[in-house]
Amino acid sequence: MALMIFRSRSARAESADPQVSDFLNGFSIEVMPRTAAKIDDFRAILPTGTRVYVAHIEGTAIDEMVATARRLSSEGFRVMPHFPARIIKDEAMLEDWIARYQGEAGVEDALVLAGGVASPAGKFDSSMQLLESGAFDRAGFKHLHVAGHPEGNRD
């Protein structure tokens, strides 16, 4: 039995155990720009409308992040880029990223997290500080997800 049939929801429902199909209904996936570049067309492997998180790893340029978000959005996916607080230097940078994701990729959702770096690059140290800035509200973002690691994150 094939466990992970991503191509279309109807194909998955017909060829997989119903319990597995129910379990996978509404799944999401995460990519990084460098790994997304290895996939010719995500529509060949994921159902349209799948939520795709775009991981922002320290050292990845915002241009690469926005380009990946734009591509995924144009292919019909619900893009949710990471906003790692410790990589974002100040409110101006946060507002620039938000504007670029919205303007260039049509993004309305975000995953807000502290980020995998030990020392903040600037003013922000936590996801709460990004939320409290009000930048996402002012921009009209529709959904904000928050990730946390109360036990610590070794990334």
Which role fits each region the language model picked out?
Residues 3-155:
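Active-site beta->alpha loop and helix N-cap motifs at the rims of alpha/beta catalytic domains
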